[in-house]
């Protein structure tokens, strides 16, 4: 669990990043969850955008993905979400 200062620092880092993954008309699949989990392990911080063709709401998608990948939702802005999960390598110093 992150405290507010850590969340603020991670949000600041995420602001400068582009979306690493996109969710389209296929919505959330097992393959997408595995890809997101692998990305979280490699980068710890993942920005995901939801395309207009997706039939799932942004908040619902964020909660489903966070639950499936055991990650935390840092922020949801528009159709973009940012997820964080500490990796075994502990890449980011908070």
Language-model segments: what does each one mean?
Residues 1-94:
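Positively charged, polar, low-complexity stretches
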């Amino acid at each position: 669990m992150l405290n507010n200062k850590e969340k603020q620092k991670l949000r600041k880092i995420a602001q400068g990043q582009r979306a690493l993954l996109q969710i389209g008309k296929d919505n959330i699949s097992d393959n997408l969850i595995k890809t997101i989990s692998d990305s979280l392990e490699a980068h710890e911080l993942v920005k995901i955008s939801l395309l207009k063709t997706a039939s799932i709401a942004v908040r619902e998608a964020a909660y489903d993905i966070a639950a499936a990948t055991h990650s935390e939702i840092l922020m949801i802005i528009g159709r973009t979400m940012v997820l964080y999960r500490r990796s075994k390598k502990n890449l980011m110093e908070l």
